UniProtKB/Swiss-Prot annotation:
PANTHER family: ATP SYNTHASE (PTHR15184), ATP SYNTHASE SUBUNIT BETA, MITOCHONDRIAL (PTHR15184:SF71)
Listed GO CC annotations: chloroplast thylakoid membrane; mitochondrion; proton-transporting ATP synthase complex
Binding site for ATP: 163-170
Highest rank taxon of the organism: Eukaryota
Record-given protein name: ATP synthase subunit beta, chloroplastic
GO biological process: proton motive force-driven mitochondrial ATP synthesis
Keywords: ATP synthesis, ATP-binding, CF(1), Chloroplast, Hydrogen ion transport, Ion transport, Membrane, Nucleotide-binding, Plastid, Thylakoid, Translocase, Transport
SUPFAM superfamilies: C-terminal domain of alpha and beta subunits of F1 ATP synthase, N-terminal domain of alpha and beta subunits of F1 ATP synthase, P-loop containing nucleoside triphosphate hydrolases
Chain's role: Produces ATP from ADP in the presence of a proton gradient across the membrane. The catalytic sites are hosted primarily by the beta subunits.
Pfam families documented for this protein: ATP-synt_ab, ATP-synt_ab_N, ATP-synt_VA_C
Subcellular localization(s) per the UniProt record: Plastid, Chloroplast thylakoid membrane
Source species of the chain: Nephroselmis olivacea
Subunit structure as annotated in this protein's UniProt entry: F-type ATPases have 2 components, CF(1) - the catalytic core - and CF(0) - the membrane proton channel. CF(1) has five subunits: alpha(3), beta(3), gamma(1), delta(1), epsilon(1). CF(0) has four main subunits: a(1), b(1), b'(1) and c(9-12).
């Protein structure tokens, strides 16, 4: 944590340590405020230097405060001196954070030296005032056809990303980071909350490989990474989301940029709060969760919004414990979401990427008075066609296509073209596939699907629609396939 400009206020002593929670005694009349950062410095039993940052959670009275540690409490002893910094945890913000990896305290952990930035902000801040909010409903164009057409993101909204292992969450996240930088001139902040350290490392390596992070010129990178992985104490996992959000708020409020904030995984934020709550002695609520669950979630989510200066659009991976959507943690999260993007293993198995399920993914923005009748009508017709195809699949599997009516055969043919046209080559996957990435503007996406639905392209082969950008590319690909087939027949 940057201590620049922090005036040391008061000193206290540790009187009790219970795991990551400690009680500290201060002189009466010199108590720290709630959320103040405390620093414990001293030597452990082996004579080694220890330095731990804690956050005040409760004022117990008689000079006693209860604080939660942001790192391991190994080596701490009763009687050690504790210093009140007089302010909340503060983290570096601004362009120098791009391309770097930070921990919950805002300390770089990527072995690339100090950030060289004296500008810091406290992680606990008020949500923007109502008069500062931008209440105009507008969609956030991603350049990804399936998202923009069927489950569009709201500018300044919150999106839940649901998907198991290996269906393409990471690649979709990296493509969104890449596209917001190119199309919106925006930046991204990634908050790794309570997930695997290996996944955090893999994400960093893949970002370097796909040039989302440019190690040769770090300042040209498009993303800042903040990690508090599952090996960290619950205090760090509970606060790392706020650290990432604070960095994103600076880009929105000071640089007036559109920012993407990724939180992976929002459930772990709740889980960490539950662990801390029990250690603080609070009475548990439903299913053992903390009684302050809705308040903690609201405190984070209400800061993620559009203002008149810029926007923070948040994409949050949501783990659903035991696939129970009524569990208090995912149920509380759903109340804040504007859209859901569901990744399907069946589509991934077919090789259709991004493997976004067009029928399960939803958005509150899919309304004719927001999108216009053209977009809304096209999206509804695409969904109806795909739904009918899904209903017919059992019949096809048992009896075959020949037993279907003429109309149903036509629906199946168009649905298969639509399914393939929903796939798209990604910029960040170029290094793996060799196919150049495509950014498809919304108007071109709508035009393409309207042409497929109208029947004008019924004569084109299905394969022409697979992994292309706009419809002109599909038509050109069909022409080259037919030319190659004619040449082969002539030979």
């Amino acid at each position: 944590m940057s201590q620049a400009g922090v005036k040391t206020k008061q000193a206290g002593k540790i009187v009790q340590i219970v795991g990551p929670v400690m009680d500290v005694a201060f002189q009466p009349g010199s108590m720290p405020n709630i959320y103040n950062a405390l620093i414990v410095k001293g030597r452990n039993g082996a004579g080694q230097e220890v330095s731990v940052v804690c956050e005040v959670q409760q004022l117990l009275g008689d000079g006693l405060v209860r604080a939660v540690s942001m790192s391991a409490t190994d080596g701490l002893m009763r009687g050690m001196e504790v210093t009140d910094t007089g302010r909340a945890l503060s983290v570096p913000v601004g362009p120098t954070t791009l391309g770097r990896i930070f921990n919950v305290l805002g300390e770089p952990v990527d072995n690339m030296g100090p950030v060289g930035n004296e500008k810091t902000l406290p992680i606990h801040r008020e949500a923007p005032a109502f008069v500062d909010l931008d209440t105009k409903l507008s969609i956030f164009e991603t350049g990804i056809k399936v998202v923009d057409l069927l489950a569009p993101y709201r500018r300044g909204g919150k999106i839940g990303l649901f998907g198991g292992a290996g269906v393409g969450k990471t690649v979709l996240i990296m493509e969104l980071i890449n596209n917001i930088a190119k199309a919106h001139g925006g930046v991204s902040v990634f908050g790794g909350v309570g997930e695997r350290t290996r996944e955090g490392n893999d994400l960093y390596m893949e970002m370097c490989e796909s040039k989302v992070i440019n190690k040769a010129d770090v300042k040209s990178s498009k993303v800042a990474l903040v990690y508090g992985q599952m090996n960290e104490p619950p205090g760090a996992r509970m606060r790392v989301g706020l650290t990432a959000l604070t960095m994103a708020e600076y880009f929105r409020d000071v640089n007036n940029q559109d920012v993407l904030l990724f939180i992976d995984n929002i459930f772990r934020f709740v889980q960490a709060g539950s662990e801390v709550s029990a250690l603080l002695g609070r009475m548990p609520s439903a299913v053992g969760y903390q009684p302050t669950l809705a308040t903690e979630m609201g405190g984070l989510q209400e800061r993620i919004t559009s203002t008149k200066d810029g926007s923070i659009t948040s994409i949050q991976a949501v783990y659903v414990p035991a696939d129970d959507l009524t569990d208090p943690a995912p149920a509380t999260t759903f109340a804040h979401l504007d859209a859901t993007t569901v990744l399907s293993r069946n589509l991934a198995a077919k090789g259709i990427y991004p493997a976004v399920d067009p029928l399960d993914s939803t958005s509150t923005m899919l309304q004719p008075w927001i999108l216009g009748d053209d977009h809304y009508g096209t999206a509804q017709r695409v969904k109806q066609t795909l739904q009918r195809y899904k209903e017919l699949q059992d019949i096809i599997a048992i009896l075959g296509l020949d037993e279907l009516s003429e109309e149903d055969r036509m629906i199946v043919a168009r649905a298969r073209k639509i399914e393939r046209f929903l796939s798209q080559p990604f910029f960040v996957a170029e290094v793996f596939t060799g196919a150049p990435g495509k950014y498809v503007p919304l108007a071109e996406s709508i035009q393409g699907f309207k042409l497929i639905l109208s029947g004008e392209l019924d004569s084109l082969p299905e394969s022409a629609f697979y992994l292309v950008g706009n419809i002109e590319e599909a038509i050109a690909k069909a022409a080259s396939i037919q030319a190659a087939a004619a040449a082969a027949a002539a030979a």
